Amino acid sequence: ILRCLVGSEMCIRDSAEIAHIEVRRRDLRWPIPDDLEQHLAGHRIMRLWRRAKYILIELSNGAIWMIHLGMSGRMIVEPSGHNEPSKRTAPHVHVVAETTRGDVVLYQDARRFGSMDWISNDQLESHPRMANLGIEPLSEALAGPWLIKRLAGKVAPMKAALLDQRLIAGLGNIYVCEALNRARISPFREAGSLKPAEAKRLAAEIRATLQEAIDAGGSSLRDYVRTDGELGYFQHAWRVYGREGEACSCGKKGVIERAAQSGRSTFYCPACQR
């Protein structure tokens, strides 16, 4: 989503000014604040980036627009000169923003599990949803020695530890399943049992899995689409997720199994993941 917003022809262009913002429903996971519009409209877009699973858009007045897509949220960008019919009248479009250049940004969320807020840029790190986030999974900080140190003594299952946003911010269920399979590590073993070579391999596979997913435009299940409305393609490269009963690619005649962990589906190969 973020790369589409900042890097492609379907983008919100840097320095574009938000001319108007319409909030149609405020009752998302957390209510959209009543003063969101006054802090966004009339100000230029200066910077776009991501922290964990949040999209952050900094404006010229020092406000940061914080967006979380939740389970089913979509950001749809209709650039100026867009020739297709607008989706602004589509069901579940809760927020419509327009720039002075004619770009239109829609927030669509059928389940309303997402969130939208604003905060002053000097208060971002202390915001309740930001203050306790861990390191970024694509950062150089994620390395074998760091994992060994942070997981030492933890008896929680490996998968549960990796999904803890206080440890690594932004990892989700699909990508943890995939990275653990690539690293040949069981999702059920104690997190503190990692050996140095395993930790090095796991850190590398987390980054590789995420980068491949980004390059493929993400994974499309029921709800996810890119900002241009197209599907992502990484689901075609999944090695274990959603492949229960299929042969694992490990070559050890393993068959992919599914188990429930903390209310989520875990897919793994018992033959190669130890």
Per-range role (PLM):
Residues 60-62, 100-102, 251:
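Glycine-centered tight beta-turn/hairpin loop motif at sheet-sheet or coil-to-beta transitions
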Residues 20-22, 47-49, 55-58, 64-70, ...:
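Short, conserved beta-strand segments within well-ordered enzyme catalytic domains
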